[in-house]
Amino acid sequence: MLKKDMNIADYDPELFNAIQNETLRQEEHIELIASENYTSPRVMQAQGSQLTNKYAEGYPGKRYYGGCEYVDVVETLAIERAKQLFGATYANVQPHSGSQANSAVYMALLKPGDTVLGMNLAHGGHLTHGSPVNFSGRLYNIIPYGIDESGKIDYDEMERLAVEHKPKMMIGGFSAYSGIVDWARMREIADKIGAYLFVDMAHVAGLIAAGVYPNPVPHAHVVTSTTHKTLAGPRGGIILSAADDEELYKKLNSAVFPGGQGGPLMHVIAGKAVAFKEALEPEFKTYQQQVVNNAKAMVEVFLERGYKIVSGGTSNHLMLVDLIGRDLTGKEADAALGSANITVNKNSVPNDPRSPFVTSGVRIGTPAITRRGFKEAEAKQLTGWICDILDDAHNPAVIERVKGQVLALCARFPVYG
């Protein structure tokens, strides 16, 4: 018999301890992984609701199960808010993740073996943009494009490759690129060769929703995103379009269900609906502008301390610190900073001589620290501590000093105040 007072703490102390330890880790560590963020208690409330019990294969008004009248309301709210947020005429909120959303786009628009032009993973792309270890690289003929010596996307080279190889689809978007993407130029290139333009805006969706980064929705045939990262919602994916093409919309819906998924996660879709409502509030724009301001402040200190930033700066929420030429790998930097309660991720950089398991760079992002309330002063102070460790990564005394400073700063800015 189920009772409302059932709890994990009494029933499963091993699991409860792991959850408690992770909660403490989040409170006592500074989170700088560019793809991570803190979602709101309202989103977590939705995810912990009885919506998790409901199976709802299909779409609102066209379900394969009965009893869906209220989950239809939930999903419709999420769809309409997503469309409003990004200026779309179509939204699918069912993908379980960004990768699932991307997979659905491939399924809807392509056949195995078709040619795709996507950003090289080593230059800032994503696994699902054509990496040979991913479904995208295994099932499709991938032509990679990249960045030039200045660290910017080389659109002339992109156009040359597009004309030469005539891909059926071009992919815009990234996982480690700190510049502004010219979506209009990409659409011009796509139109020149009759290709689809598909944009994966997962990393910058929150910035786009707030108007502090260019919106690809008016330019692309299809746009996908995660709903976490800068958007600060639950872990999940969405597909958007403003193409006003009902046949395209039907293909996308069919590629999600039944093509790639069965029942949607209604409790997560409720969390998405809440997050989209939060993203429509004026304070969300203030938050996203601060995310960019903090990233620029961090870059300023890195450059002052003699560190190289790929592309020389940032126009979004992230930066890539290039450690080539230094006696320090990305893996070592990641570990040293982690010992001081600063969480980053090792990351390959352009022309990286080291393997993806070691790398010569670290990727740093500001969404989570900004969510805690950090502003430019804290961002600069933190970057100074990071440089202290990178300058002397094998010195336990430096790591312990910085760890103490980090703990004090975290105590001033709790994740959930």
From Swiss-Prot:
Location of the protein in the cell: Cytoplasm
InterPro entries registered for this protein in UniProt: PyrdxlP-dep_Trfase, PyrdxlP-dep_Trfase_major, PyrdxlP-dep_Trfase_small, Ser_HO-MeTrfase, Ser_HO-MeTrfase-like, Ser_HO-MeTrfase_PLP_BS, SHMT-like_dom
EC nos: 2.1.2.1
Positions of post-translational N6-(pyridoxal phosphate)lysine modification: 229
GO biological process, one term: glycine biosynthetic process from serine
Predominant localisation class: cytoplasm
Site positions (Plays an important role in substrate specificity): 228
Cofactor section: pyridoxal 5'-phosphate
Residues binding (6S)-5,6,7,8-tetrahydrofolate: 121, 125-127, 355-357
Protein's pathway: One-carbon metabolism; tetrahydrofolate interconversion; Amino-acid biosynthesis; glycine biosynthesis; glycine from L-serine: step 1/1
PROSITE patterns, per database record: SHMT (PS00096)
Keyword check for Protein biosynthesis: no
SS bond partners: none
Presence of keyword Cell wall biogenesis/degradation: no
Catalysed reactions, as listed in the record: (6R)-5,10-methylene-5,6,7,8-tetrahydrofolate + glycine + H2O = (6S)-5,6,7,8-tetrahydrofolate + L-serine
GO cellular component: cytoplasm; cytosol
Subunit (UniProt): Homodimer.
Family classification: Belongs to the SHMT family.
Name assigned to this protein: Serine hydroxymethyltransferase
Record organism: Shewanella oneidensis (strain ATCC 700550 / JCM 31522 / CIP 106686 / LMG 19005 / NCIMB 14063 / MR-1)
Gene: glyA
